[in-house]
């Protein structure tokens, strides 16, 4: 509204100034007289807009609003194919399936609740700082701790590039990515073909020894989205990679080798006793050398970029797939949107992934990464509260202790605004798609408030329970610097504002005895 008012005022100014001659402007001393101008310059028609631009500087652009400078466009995607990348001793085994746009967004009138419908994606121009040659970095770091330290100490060349990125302020864009992330769970292997001599039909159990990425493309392959499959954990229905995912989840997201209590079988031997002491270098080495997913996802990314050399790549994923997507986005500097992902910043630090240099002293390079995490705060995994000996995660052998995300996070306050209870079912991608993203957040909040008012008018009992960010320490503002009043602004938006979690801290109850990086 304010920008619109300014635009009308500016139009009045323009019309008023138009009644003056150029000579009148010269007499006021606003532009040099004719004798001070080159003849060729003075002969050009006087552009009042250029003159106003000089007067107002960049403020003229602000008066018209940012929308005119967003350079938005719309893209539609369909499911083109899927890749399966083996890991560990089966890293050479790959498979591919072609789907020929089986899931598509061609019909703009399609039912958005239909799982096979993907809404169009709106894009914006975004400047990203990324390594000039990330593939060389990945090649140098190898799979040993020593190689990773060598790569981390190597000075990288960085570049600023303007790219098309998904406009996550648009609900339908967020919904489209969520549906693509959901499609990555489809486990029909009837269409898979082996690559490099690998025959899926004669390799029992191959689905449980790798990662999967579904490839969505525009019709001209100008842009592709890689959707990585997330965790097939047993308490959410199990799946063909549940055993492998559990081991890697515990390596990636636990504070110290999944050492929840003395009765646990840990995934590494870094616990040093005294209740809360752990070896920092030890857990870094264990994650780099024992976790098989990071080298596998970089291999998958390289294979996809080789198959689509002229396409820009975006990445998405849910749960573990979202965390792995974020690690890829950090490594290769590509736009990434994740859903209900556990905090992956600690894993990125332990893996010693490269961070671009900060542009300003007060700017966080972690917050500037082209990564956006989307989750609702009723999910104990995404909020980092599914831990402790009595938690659901612990009961099934998962030590989901990390909570801090890189980039920025869009957090739907389903607990405070919609009255949801904290439950593991809120971690499901279908819960987010069906119960949150089908309409604008502002509309959902409005309907909930109207329902509460209706109950109150009939004499019913209303429970209003406040909720704060899970890493809140009791201050008057959240640890990320946003007050409760700031987050209430989300109630008026189609999608909550993306905010940094840079002040979040993981594993504050642990003491790491080596130097902490």
From Swiss-Prot:
Positions bearing carbohydrate: 187, 221, 303
Membrane spanning stretches: 7-27
Catalysis: reaction(s): a triacylglycerol + H2O = a diacylglycerol + a fatty acid + H(+)
Matching Gene3D superfamilies: alpha/beta hydrolase
Entry EC no(s): 3.1.1.3
Example of a GO cellular component annotation carried by this entry: vacuolar lumen
Membrane topology (UniProt): Single-pass type II membrane protein
Keywords: Autophagy, Endosome, Glycoprotein, Hydrolase, Lipid degradation, Lipid metabolism, Membrane, Signal-anchor, Transmembrane, Transmembrane helix
GO biological processes: multivesicular body membrane disassembly; neutral lipid catabolic process; pexophagy; phosphatidylserine catabolic process; piecemeal microautophagy of the nucleus; vacuolar protein processing
UniProt key word Ubl conjugation: no
Biased composition (Acidic residues): 477-491
Main subcellular location: membrane
Subcellular location field: Endosome, Multivesicular body membrane; Prevacuolar compartment membrane
Matches recorded under Pfam families: Lipase_3 (PF01764)
Cytoplasmic side: 1-6
Keyword Transmembrane helix: yes
Entry annotation: catalytic residues: 319
Assembly: Binds to both phosphatidylinositol (PI) and phosphatidylinositol 3,5-bisphosphate (PIP2).
Role, per record: Lipase which is essential for lysis of subvacuolar cytoplasm to vacuole targeted bodies and intravacuolar autophagic bodies. Involved in the lysis of intravacuolar multivesicular body (MVB) vesicles. The intravacuolar membrane disintegration by ATG15 is critical to life span extension.
Protein name: Putative lipase ATG15
Annotated gene: ATG15
């Amino acid at each position: 509204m304010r920008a619109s008012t300014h635009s009308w005022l500016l139009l009045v100014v323009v019309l008023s100034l138009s009644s003056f001659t150029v000579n009148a402007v010269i007499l006021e001393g606003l532009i040099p007289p004719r004798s001070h101008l080159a003849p060729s310059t003075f002969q050009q028609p006087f552009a009042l807009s250029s003159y106003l631009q000089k007067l107002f500087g960049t403020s003229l652009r602000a008066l018209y609003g940012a929308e005119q400078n967003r350079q938005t466009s719309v893209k539609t995607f369909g499911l083109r194919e899927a890749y399966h990348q083996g890991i560990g001793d089966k890293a050479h085994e790959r498979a591919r399936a072609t789907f020929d746009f089986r899931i598509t967004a061609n019909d703009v009138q399609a039912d958005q609740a239909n799982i096979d419908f993907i809404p169009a994606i709106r894009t914006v121009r975004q400047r990203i700082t990324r390594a000039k040659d990330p593939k060389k970095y990945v090649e140098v770091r190898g799979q040993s701790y020593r190689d990773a330290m060598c790569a981390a100490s190597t000075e990288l060349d960085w570049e600023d590039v303007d790219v098309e990125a998904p406009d996550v302020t648009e609900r339908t864009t967020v919904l489209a990515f969520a549906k693509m992330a959901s499609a990555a769970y489809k486990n029909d292997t009837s269409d898979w073909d082996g690559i490099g001599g690998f025959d899926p039909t004669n390799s029992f159990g191959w689905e449980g020894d790798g990662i999967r990425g579904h490839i969505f493309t525009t019709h001209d392959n100008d842009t592709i989205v890689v959707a990585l499959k997330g965790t097939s954990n047993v308490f959410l229905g199990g799946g063909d990679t549940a055993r492998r995912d559990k081991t890697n989840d515990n390596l990636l997201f636990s504070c110290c080798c999944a050492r929840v209590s003395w009765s646990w079988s840990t995934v590494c031997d870094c616990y040093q006793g005294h209740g809360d002491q752990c070896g920092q270098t030890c857990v870094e080495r264990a994650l780099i050398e024992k976790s098989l997913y990071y080298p596998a996802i970089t291999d998958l990314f390289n294979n996809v970029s080789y198959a689509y050399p002229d396409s820009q790549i975006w990445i998405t994923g849910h749960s573990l797939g979202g965390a792995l997507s974020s690690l890829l986005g950090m490594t290769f500097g590509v736009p990434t949107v994740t859903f209900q992902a556990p905090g992956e910043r600690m894993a990125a630090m332990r893996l010693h992934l490269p961070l671009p240099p900060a542009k300003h002293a007060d700017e966080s390079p972690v917050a500037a990464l082209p990564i956006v995490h989307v989750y609702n705060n009723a999910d104990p995994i995404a909020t980092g509260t599914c831990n402790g000996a009595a938690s659901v995660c612990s009961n099934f052998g998962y030590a989901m202790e990390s909570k801090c995300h890189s980039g920025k996070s869009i957090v739907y306050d389903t607990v405070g605004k919609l009255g949801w209870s904290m439950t593991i079912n809120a971690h499901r991608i279908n819960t987010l798609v069906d119960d949150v993203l089908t309409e604008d957040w502002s509309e959902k909040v409005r309907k909930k408030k109207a329902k509460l008012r209706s109950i109150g008018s009939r004499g019913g009992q209303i429970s209003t329970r406040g909720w704060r960010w899970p890493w809140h320490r009791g201050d008057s503002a959240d640890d990320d610097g946003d007050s409760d009043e700031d987050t209430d602004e989300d109630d008026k938006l189609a999608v909550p504002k993306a905010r940094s979690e840079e002040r979040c801290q993981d594993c504050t109850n642990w003491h790491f005895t080596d130097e902490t990086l």
